[in-house]
Structures are given as C-alpha cells and as structure tokens.
From Swiss-Prot:
It comes from the Bacteria. Keywords: Amino-acid biosynthesis, Histidine biosynthesis, Hydrolase, Magnesium, Metal-binding. Its EC number is 3.1.3.15. Substrate binds at E69, I86, D87, G88, T89, R190, D218. Disruption phenotype: Cells lacking this gene exhibit an auxotrophy for histidine, but can grow on minimal medium supplemented with histidinol. This is Histidinol-phosphatase. Pathway: Amino-acid biosynthesis; L-histidine biosynthesis; L-histidine from 5-phospho-alpha-D-ribose 1-diphosphate: step 8/9. Changing G118R: Requires histidine to grow. Its cofactor is Mg(2+). The gene is hisN. It comes from Streptomyces coelicolor (strain ATCC BAA-471 / A3(2) / M145). Mg(2+) 1 binds at E69, D84, I86. GO terms for biological process: L-histidine biosynthetic process.
Length: 266
C-alpha cells in the first residue's frame, strides 16, 4: 500500500505558503478582482496562491500533474494535485472570513483518479482539516497538534442538521421541490456555504449537506476528509467520490434519505 504521509506533509507546506499569501491580501483596499467567463469573480490573491502552490510542486513533485481552478491542467501521469486556491472567493473579496485553500492529491485507480490526500486550510478562521487514505481525518493547526474527526451518529431526519450554499442552483436544476421538502423534515437548516459544511459533517456538527453544481477542485479535498471521518460523499446520482459535478455528503446513516429527497420529481 502506498504511503502518502510525505505527500500530506508537503500539502501542509503548500497550505502554509498559500495562507501567508492570501491573508496578506485579505481585506486589502486595493485588491484587484476580475470577472471570469463563467461570471464568477477571481482575485489577484486566487492567482497568486495557485501560482505559488504550482511553483512548490514543480520543485518537490516534478513528475506529478497539477489541476488548478485558475490555470487548468499541467502535466500527465498517475498522480495529480487538484487545487482550489481560494474556495469562497465571493466571501474573500467582501471581507467574510469563510474561505479556504483546498489541496488534494489524486491517484489513477480503477474507475479514474481518486483522492488519496486532502487538506482544507481556512486561515481567516484559524482552522485546518486533512485526511490521508486509510489513515483517518484530523483537524488542528499542525500535524503535531491535531485531533481525529468522526461524523455524527444521528440516524433520523427530524434530529438532523442540513447545510447548503444557496437556493438558486436547486431551482435551476428542477430540484427545488425536493430540496424544500427535505428542509421541512430536518431539525435545522443553515446556508454555511462552500467548503465549511463538508468540514462540519466530518466533525459531526452537521449531519447532511449538498450542492447542485460543483467542479472537481471544489470537491476533491472535501470528499476524502468526509469519508475518512466515517461519512459518505457522493454525487446526487449516488456515485462515490467527487466526479458527478455536484455533491451530497452525510454521516452515512442518512445518505439514502438525502439522495431520495434531492432526486424526487427529477
């Protein structure tokens, strides 16, 4: 079995560098922001953080390929680093501290690339989460100061906390009725958004979360952290992993019900 612990240590080094770069420009009055063709914002900090990570990887892992949100895919091979330099750019540019750098290492396996290392670093919140395949999921500020994550044991929707990002995507995909039905069945709903609800599923403070449209870089790190914490991460089609263009994550006990509601009348 491959040992990915050296890759995890590298992911922490990458995150440390990205944290310094992104925090340096967070709330800067002269922050430059552009609009991408898909009408989403990108800041100078997004680009700088991804370039920084790519530079480190080119020196530390020259044979690995890289797939980043801002600069696409570079290289080929069985190992691929997937990077979202700032997940939550809209929050970042408005001074909201809920944003993070997402770093995943994916390896070619049967059925395609699968995440084997994942790290989420949210420096404005002072939080970091990570996981390695078959080694569990953890949170802390460093490898030497961490505690293990476990999903909740909640087994009924009436006791469950459900998190999401926004309503518009569910309506655009014709899934709003099922989504609203689900919100009526659960104990609590909150629109935490972006990476955060997945980390809370892994921590056991949220039981369910879902988003109707995502890219690989939005999901790769989140997926392995949730699953290594004992949870379930699939697309809305039930396919395991971050490959469906959308996501559903849970403590596992409620996953079938989550998918059932979000797929009804669709």
């Amino acid at each position: 079995m491959p040992d990915y612990l050296d890759d995890l240590r590298l992911a922490h080094v990458l995150a440390d560098a990205a944290d310094a770069a992104t925090m340096d420009r967070f709330k800067a009055l002269d922050l430059k922001v552009e609009t991408k063709p898909d009408m989403t914002p990108v800041s100078e900090a997004d680009k700088a953080a991804e370039e920084l990570i790519r530079g480190h990887l080119s020196r530390a892992r020259p044979r690995d390929s890289v797939h980043g949100e801002e600069f696409g895919v570079a290289g080929t091979g069985p190992r691929r680093w997937v990077i979202d330099p700032i997940d939550g750019t809209k929050n970042y540019v408005r001074g909201v501290p809920v944003w993070a750098t997402l770093i995943a290492l994916m390896e070619a396996k049967e059925g395609g690339y699968q995440p084997v290392v994942g790290l989420v670093s949210a420096p404005a919140l002072g939080r970091r989460w990570w996981a390695v395949e078959d080694h569990g999921a953890f949170t802390g500020r460093s490898l030497t100061s961490a505690h293990r994550l476990h999903v909740s044991q909640v087994s009924t929707l009436s006791d469950a906390s459900f998190a999401y990002s926004s309503l518009s995507g569910w309506e655009e995909q014709g899934r709003l009725d099922g989504f609203l039905d689900l919100t009526r069945e659960v104990w609590r709903t909150r629109a935490y958004g972006d990476f955060w609800p997945y980390m809370m599923v892994a921590e056991g403070s949220v039981d369910l979360c879902a988003e109707p449209e995502l890219s690989l870089w939005d999901m790769a790190a989140n997926a392995i952290i949730v699953t290594e914490a004992g949870g379930t991460f699939t697309g809305l089609d039930g396919r395991p992993g971050p490959h469906s263009g959308n996501a559903a994550a849970s403590n596992g006990r409620l996953h079938d019900e989550l998918l059932g509601y979000l797929n009804q009348r669709y």
